[in-house]
Every structure is written in structure tokens, then in C-alpha cells.
């Protein structure tokens, strides 16, 4: 019989300059090795991963666009996602919403997709540890939504931060998300496998989904 394989949906959110690109590149290179991937980014996507890198990683590339299969989340997202799954049958679809996108909206858009072959696998938010406080104050609605709905929060630019500053940032994040796995170790010091196992922790994922359903 035909192998029925689920396509995992991995969502990476975060503000411009937070380090999403670096993280996604690392995951593509090291953790998703040998898997069939499709990358979907918003029309404001700033991933800037060049076509060469994607081709090397064997990621499906859409000639019309410099880089990857991009489809705007503004357009008919469900149709686009179903088409990608039908055409390419990927192991994973990586979604990178725009920096100011609300993570909850993206999760809901994926949940609305009527396709049994799709499983919402993880939603990770990358947070620039140096700007944590400022973003909460100035972009509260969007930033807090990304923090509150994350199953895993990866803090970036933590290399030169003092312990005090670091724990202040973790405390702020904890106020908005009590259950997410928070990674404060510099991404460069972790293996992609370590990152993946933290991102894919199912218990936090279930809690986030249950909480979203209540809203």
C-alpha cells in the first residue's frame, strides 16, 4: 500500500532582525537534512535566503520567485497550502509569517486547512533579547501575541548579555507565556537536534492549542 505520511507544519515567527533567518538556515542545514521541505513566507518576508542555498538544501524552488515557494498568507492560504502538499508532498512545510504578523492568526489559518495529511507540528518565536522590553512597550499587540502563542521561544543575541539582563528578559517573557520552552543559550552553541527537540515538545504545544481554542 501507499505510504501515508503526514506533512508537518513548522511556524517560525519573530520581529525583523530577531534572527529568524539564521535559525531557519541552521535548521534546514542540520536538522531537516534529507527531508523534503517547502518554505512559505509572507509577502513581507525578509528571509532573504538565496536561491542557491535553498537549491543546495534540495528545497523546492519556484522559478517565479527568487528563492522559494512563496505564497502570501493574505491570499487564499488554505488553497495555497493544499496545492503545495498535493504538488510536492513535502515532509515539512516551514512557514515564516511577516515580522508584524500575529502568530495566533497564522496558527488559526493552518488549523482551518481541511486536510488530513497536515499536522501542526510546532510554532517557535525568535525574540531579540536586547529589545524584549522595548518591543513589549511599543509593539505590544503584535509582539505579545507572538510570545503568548509560542510553543518554544528562542532568545537571540544573548551572547554578550549579562546574567541580570538575561533573566530580566526571561521574566518578562514568562509573564506572557508560562509554559513555552525558553532557550537563552546562543543558537550557535546548540546543535540543531537540541533545538528541534525543544521546539517539538508536544506537551507545550497541546497547551497552547487548548488555550487558543478557548479564546
Q: Where would I find each of the regions flagged by the language model?
A:
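Short histidine/acidic/glycine/proline-rich micro-motifs that form metal-
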Residues: 132, 159-160
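Short, hinge-like loop/turn segments at secondary-structure boundaries
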Residues: 55-58, 112, 141-143, 171, ...
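Short, Lys/Arg-enriched N-terminal segments with co-localized hydrophobic residues
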Residues: 1-5
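C-terminal accessory "lid"/substrate-recognition subdomains
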Residues: 149, 161-215
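Flexible active-site lid/hinge loop adjacent to a nucleotide/diphosphate
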Residues: 137-149
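Nucleotide-state-sensitive switch-loop elements of NTP-binding domains
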Residues: 7-13, 18, 22-136
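Conserved beta-strand/loop subsegment of P-loop NTPase cores
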Residues: 38, 93-94, 118-127, 147-158, ...
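A short alpha->loop->secondary-structure connector
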Residues: 111-118, 143-144, 170-180
Amino acid at each position: 500500500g501507499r505510504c501515508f505520511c503526514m506533512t508537518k507544519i513548522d511556524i517560525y515567527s519573530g520581529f525583523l532582525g530577531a534572527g529568524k533567518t539564521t535559525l531557519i538556515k541552521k535548521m534546514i542545514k542540520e536538522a531537516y537534512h534529507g527531508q523534503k521541505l517547502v518554505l512559505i513566507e509572507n509577502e513581507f518576508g525578509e528571509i532573504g535566503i538565496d536561491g542557491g542555498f535553498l537549491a543546495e538544501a534540495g528545497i523546492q524552488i519556484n522559478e517565479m520567485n527568487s528563492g522559494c515557494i512563496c505564497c502570501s498568507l493574505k491570499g487564499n492560504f488554505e488553497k495555497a497550502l493544499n496545492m503545495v502538499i498535493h504538488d510536492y508532498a513535502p515532509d515539512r512545510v516551514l512557514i515564516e509569517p511577516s515580522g508584524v504578523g500575529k502568530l495566533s492568526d497564522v496558527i488559526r489559518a493552518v488549523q482551518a486547512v481541511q486536510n488530513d495529511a497536515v499536522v501542526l507540528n510546532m510554532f517557535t518565536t525568535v525574540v531579540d533579547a536586547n529589545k524584549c522590553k522595548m518591543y513589549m512597550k511599543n509593539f505590544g499587540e503584535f509582539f505579545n501575541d507572538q510570545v503568548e502563542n509560542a510553543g518554544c521561544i528562542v532568545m537571540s543575541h544573548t551572547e554578550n548579555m549579562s546574567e541580570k539582563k538575561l533573566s530580566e528578559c526571561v521574566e518578562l517573557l514568562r509573564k506572557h507565556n508560562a509554559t513555552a520552552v525558553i532557550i537563552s543559550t546562543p543558537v550557535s552553541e546548540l546543535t540543531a537536534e537540541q533545538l528541534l527537540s525543544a521546539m517539538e515538545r508536544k506537551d507545550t504545544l497541546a497547551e497552547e492549542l487548548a488555550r487558543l481554542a478557548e479564546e
